[in-house]
């Protein structure tokens, strides 16, 4: 790689050149992002996964930009038109769009009016127009031809030449771009209200904002409303100012020049710059939406698992009945059943449903009922709460079932439960989401999980890449039990792919539990490189070697053995842990031939072997009584769980059917730049009711105590 690229990367990302170079070298050697972040900290200067990904992504972008520059320079040079000034401008361009703007006048075009006019020899006439020649008519008559048989048509052809040249002038286009970006407004007006029955886009029926200040979520809303045909989006410019600037380029003036200015400005340059700015606004908005979705997804995947609980999954429905699934403490399916707990079922069927649910609770000692939040959720919650009056030891939780139906109809679900209906598989998924959200949610396309903002309006390729990165990062940070993980979960482990993951599951089924990390090497097609990349992230809870249930990499086992001998440690009891805490990191690292960061991580793992970082995050709120919107009053204090974070606020589940909105203005008494600075998906928060709209079934909440708001 050229030094210029490394320096640009380092400068743009605020890193040392050596860090950038090291990351790119490690990546070229086949190391994964999770592996580099966790086990090569000394080499990278302790960069995390996001920083490493940023280096890799920006390197690709810079390479693409550089390749395009070289192609453009070669093509212009082949035409004999490459000046030193143009070459310097292309080489200095920081965006692909700027390179294309500079290349525009030299780009091969389909035959245009201007092309035909030039071929007919009308260029000298165009020059005479610029000079405001008094003999235009006579000169035009000299240049008439079969294609341009009259002087009027010849003059029109000459004007076409000037319009094309003028509209491709880079300095004019650049000035216009900056003028629109800094000083123009973007507006929207109602086009067809019949396409917006719920008035979702009402705010955009008559909307205006500065282009430079337009927020990302508004950009995406305008795009969607325009695409649906509800609104018309346009720009409002200072055309008089633009016209003055364009006119100043001409020393002479005449009607033909005026036409060149108007045609170039209104028909060529402004539309082109509007398209570019809309595209850039959309790209920035998409990046923001994807970043927010990624952040929400990470927090959702890190929700604390409810381990060791007997759970009943409850997939609500009206006509077809609720599907129930009982899973044991390990997530293994025990039984399924269908009951009819809500209308239109008869009273006799509802009474039978109560008895059936009560029998299941008693028979299997159900501790928690996980109710899906879809159709008939509110009625099902009331039904469950009524039954639980006789079972004070049992609670219920409303679980976000987004994507459960996608999973239940998937090939993976059919393979897991070939004899069950789609609905029963969905109930199992709902129950397991409570027990181990990460293990269950990795089975679902992240886009279907429903914690985003306009996720269907953004680049699906870019969204998938970023969400996959989040899933991979979280899975490896948490670690995976190699003996219980599904092949889907294993496939997200560093160094493993679909085939190797399936081979691990097949190996377990054939040989029983894997007893040690060393045994993992026996799995077919799991070679030395895959083992190196994966081993530290795979856990074996009951292994003879306690290190096999930690994040300590096998490459560090000899050093840990030396450490144990040095400290006379034979077991990780309290005495051993005190010795580890008292270590001088710098001296010990040097003695063991380890980096300080690596030793620090090793000690953290030894102090808490088998630790699950998700245990530090919030667990779901357990309930026994149902709460309805009509029960709420303004100023009432409640506890809730953050379900989704968007640019304008956050949605919180407080136990009523509809999630309440905390607008960004209600998040703090001081200014909040973005909701994600205050709350995250999965957070438990104390809120106060600020508005209850029974008619539209909407709820507004606040994080600010009304008694302290002034």
Residues of each region from the PLM?
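Duplex nucleic acid-engaging cores and interfaces of nucleic-acid transaction enzymes
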Residues: 51-53, 65-75, 79-313, 317-419, ...
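Long, charge-rich intrinsically disordered scaffolds of nucleic-acid metabolism proteins
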Residues: 98, 397, 403, 408-478, ...
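A glycine-rich phosphate-binding loop feature that marks nucleotide/adenosyl-phosphate handling sites
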Residues: 178-186, 314-318, 375-379, 399-406, ...
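Long, charged amphipathic helices and adjacent flexible linkers at domain junctions
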Residues: 276-294, 448-479, 587-634
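Low-complexity, acidic/Ser/Thr- and charged residue-rich accessory regions of DNA metabolism proteins
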Residues: 139-141, 147-151, 207-210, 229, ...
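Short flexible coil/turn linkers enriched for glycine and charged/polar residues
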Residues: 16-17, 29-30, 96, 122, ...
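Accessory alpha-helical DNA-binding modules that contact the DNA backbone or grooves
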Residues: 32, 44, 48-149, 477-616, ...
């Amino acid at each position: 790689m050229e030094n210029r690229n490394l320096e640009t990367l380092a400068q743009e990302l605020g890193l040392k050149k050596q860090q950038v170079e090291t990351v790119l070298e490690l990546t070229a050697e086949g190391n994964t992002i999770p592996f580099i972040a966790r086990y090569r900290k000394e080499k990278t200067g302790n960069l995390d996964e996001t920083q490493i990904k940023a280096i890799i992504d920006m390197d690709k972008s810079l390479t693409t930009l550089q390749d395009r520059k070289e192609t453009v320079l070669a093509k212009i040079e082949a035409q004999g038109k490459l000046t030193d000034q143009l070459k310097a401008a292309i080489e200095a361009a920081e965006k692909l769009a700027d390179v294309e703007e500079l290349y525009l006048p030299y780009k091969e075009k389909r035959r245009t009016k201007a092309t035909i006019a030039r071929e007919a020899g009308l260029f000298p006439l165009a020059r005479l127009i610029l000079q405001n020649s008094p003999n235009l008519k006579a000169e035009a008559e000299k240049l008439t031809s079969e294609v341009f048989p009259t002087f009027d048509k010849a003059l029109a052809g000459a004007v076409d030449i000037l319009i094309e040249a003028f509209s491709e002038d880079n300095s004019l286009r650049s000035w216009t771009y900056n003028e629109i970006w800094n000083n123009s407004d973007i507006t929207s007006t109602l086009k067809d209200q019949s396409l917006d029955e719920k008035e979702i886009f009402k705010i955009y029926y008559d909307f205006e904002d500065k282009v430079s200040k337009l927020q990302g979520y508004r950009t995406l809303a305008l795009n969607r409303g325009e695409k649906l045909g509800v609104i018309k989006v346009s720009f409002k410019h200072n055309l008089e100012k633009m016209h003055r600037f364009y006119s100043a380029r001409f020393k002479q003036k005449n009607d033909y020049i005026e036409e060149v200015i108007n045609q170039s400005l209104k028909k060529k340059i402004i539309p082109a710059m509007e398209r570019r700015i809309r595209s850039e606004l959309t790209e920035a908005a998409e990046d923001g939406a994807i970043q927010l979705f990624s952040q929400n997804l990470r927090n959702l995947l890190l929700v604390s698992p409810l381990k060791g609980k007997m759970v009943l999954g409850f997939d609500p429905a009206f006509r077809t009945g609720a599907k129930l699934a009982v899973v044991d403490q390990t997530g293994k399916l025990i039984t399924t059943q269908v009951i009819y707990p809500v209308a239109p079922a008869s009273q006799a069927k509802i009474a039978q449903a109560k008895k059936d649910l009560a029998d299941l609770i008693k028979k299997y000692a159900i501790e928690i009922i996980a109710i899906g939040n879809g159709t008939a959720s509110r009625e099902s919650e009331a039904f469950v709460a009524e039954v639980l009056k006789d079972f004070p030891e049992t609670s219920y939780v409303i679980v976000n079932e987004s994507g459960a139906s996608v999973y239940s109809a998937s090939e993976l679900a059919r393979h897991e439960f070939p004899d069950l209906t789609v609905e029963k598989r969905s109930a199992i998924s709902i129950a397991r989401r409570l027990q181990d959200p990460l293990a269950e949610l990795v089975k679902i396309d992240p886009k279907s999980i429903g914690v985003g903002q306009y996720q269907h309006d953004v680049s699906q390729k870019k969204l998938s890449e970023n969400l996959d990165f989040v899933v991979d990062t979280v899975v490896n940070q948490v670690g995976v039990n190699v003996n219980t993980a599904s092949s889907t979960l294993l496939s997200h482990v560093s160094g493993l792919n679909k085939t190797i993951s399936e081979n691990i599951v097949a190996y377990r089924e054939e040989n029983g539990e894997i007893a040690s990390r060393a045994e993992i090497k026996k799995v077919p097609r799991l070679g030395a490189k895959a083992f190196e990349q994966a081993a530290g992230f795979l856990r074996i809870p009951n292994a003879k070697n306690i290190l096999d249930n930690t994040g300590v990499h096998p490459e560090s086992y000899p050093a840990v053995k030396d450490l144990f001998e040095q400290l006379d440690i034979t077991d990780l009891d309290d005495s051993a842990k005190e010795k580890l805490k008292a270590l001088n990191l710098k001296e010990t690292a040097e003695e063991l031939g380890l980096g300080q960061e690596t030793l620090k991580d090793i000690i953290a793992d030894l102090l808490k072997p088998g630790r699950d970082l998700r245990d530090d995050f919030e667990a779901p709120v357990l309930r026994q009584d149902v709460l309805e919107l009509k029960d709420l009053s303004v100023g009432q204090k409640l506890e809730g769980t953050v379900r989704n974070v968007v640019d304008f606020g956050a949605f919180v589940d407080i136990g009523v059917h509809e999630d309440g909105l905390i607008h960004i203005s209600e998040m703090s008494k001081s200014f909040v730049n973005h909701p994600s600075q205050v709350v995250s998906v999965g957070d438990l928060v104390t809120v106060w009711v600020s508005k209850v709209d029974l008619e539209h079934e909407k709820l507004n909440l606040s994080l600010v105590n009304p008694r302290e708001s002034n």
